[in-house]
Amino acid sequence: MCSGGIMKIRYAKKSEKEIAIKFWKDSFKDSEEQIKFYFDNIYNEKNYLVLEDNSKIVSSLHENDYIFNFNNESIKSKYIVGVSSDIAMRNKGYMSKLLISMLENSKKKAMPFVFLTPINPKIYRKFGFEYFSNIEYYNFSIEELANFKLPNNEYSYLEINDKNKKLYLKDLIKVYNSNMEDKFCYLERDNFYFDKILKEAISDEMKIFILYKNKVASAYIIFGLYEENIEIRECLALNSISYKEILALIYGYRDYYKNVSLASPNNSNLEFLFENQLNIEKIVKPFMMLRILDPLAIFKNLKLENSNIKIYIEDKILKENTGLYS
């Protein structure tokens, strides 16, 4: 019970999409295009968890399905986004109840963990979330690319757009996987997921190119052009030579754009592609937070069964997790 009413947590009905859109608009600074993209391509009422008080939706969140590769094992998980409460109903504890319900729910569905990208990590630490990954940003003058050359042998740079994108999904996934196979954890991308990434980039008016050398997909880049800056959302290659060759494409914009900002997965160490590391500003920021729901599943995944480790866990929210694990 709360504010004299009856509270209920449930998944949304088909007819409640407009409510979801209004909550999003009231709570986040996304542009109309970004909101339209999300609700046209990603939103699913079956994953939209709402809290009702007196039959009125007062708080909500979205649980989007993802497959995580965690220590070489594919794990079904949920990426939590759009956690928000009615503007007039904030600070009444609705969001806490909703988040706790989501955690209990996900545990019942045998998920070892859920994850999110926080606007404010302090809020989510109260619920047992903690950072587990970083993202790297590299800022440099476009002139730093002056020595990056195009390939010498048979090659082509192909621009990917809405009409042809399906033709390149398999090759994009190959380049992505070759970069991820040595990582401890990463999001798995299938055709459906990669198609969504390309759709979002196209909706954000970004450009996408893939580099073929001797008919083999060797690198791809997703970037946007803004005033004096080029922002590279994602750039991956089979090796450092192909990485330089895809960045050589960016140098073609030097007459119009002065600076480049490049986002990259943790431990990319891209500064070593350049001749002078001191000219490259590298910023490492915490990226995603994770909440463990099933400690035993995680210990199994970490292959800790045979090691002589004893761990005591106190979980104030999922109390059944509290105990000594050995």
Describe the role of every protein-language-model region.
Residues 2-3, 18, 154-326:
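Intrinsically disordered, low-complexity, positively biased terminal segments
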Residues 2-60, 64-65, 72-79, 146-191, ...:
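Short amphipathic alpha-helix that is part of the acyltransferase structural core
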Residues 68, 117, 130-147:
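Conserved catalytic-core motifs of GNAT/GCN5-like acyltransferases
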Residues 83-85, 235:
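Hydrophobic adenine-recognition pocket in adenosine-nucleotide-binding enzymes
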Residues 89-101, 111, 241-245:
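Conserved acetyl-CoA pyrophosphate-binding loop and the N-cap/start of the following alpha-helix
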Residues 108-112, 118-136, 267-283:
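Conserved active-site alpha-helix within GNAT-family acetyltransferase domains
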